[in-house]
């Protein structure tokens, strides 16, 4: 009995969980769920891009997401995005936070990490909060640009 219990812990998932996953995959429930998520995230991505058009000053470049949950931005050369930057501090004062781009790169002694990029996520935020967050980022950017 002890070997059977140990085997369940060492070699994978329980039979019940495997059966549930099989049913979700073969019934179409999983694909239906993925389609719902895609629609939800597409709406959030569109909301973020529309908010960027309304609130972000000229000179900031943005990616148009073709997938995933992030929008990447590149600031003009004079604006840095690191944790100790004026922009990061201004964003915090606006009660808004972004991920500095330099935190998203692997350490590589042969390459410098970019210091004027940021990553914004629309994955867990509501559309209302996406709009408000981009408006706050716009105010922070205007203070430092």
Give the positions of each predicted feature.
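PLP-dependent class I/II
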Residues: 1-145
């Amino acid at each position: 009995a002890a070997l059977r219990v140990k085997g369940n812990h060492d070699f994978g998932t329980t039979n019940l969980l495997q059966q549930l996953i099989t049913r979700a995959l073969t019934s179409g429930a999983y694909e239906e769920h993925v389609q719902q998520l895609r629609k939800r995230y597409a709406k959030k991505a569109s909301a973020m891009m529309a908010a960027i058009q309304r609130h972000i000053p000229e000179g900031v470049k943005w990616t148009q997401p073709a997938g995933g949950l992030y929008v990447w931005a590149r600031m003009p050369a004079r604006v840095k995005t690191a944790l100790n930057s004026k922009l990061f501090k201004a964003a915090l004062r606006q009660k808004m936070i972004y991920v500095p781009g330099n935190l998203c790169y692997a350490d590589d002694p042969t390459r410098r990490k970019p210091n004027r990029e940021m990553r914004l996520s629309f994955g867990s935020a509501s559309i209302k909060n996406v709009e408000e967050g981009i408006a706050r980022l716009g105010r922070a950017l205007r203070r430092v640009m």
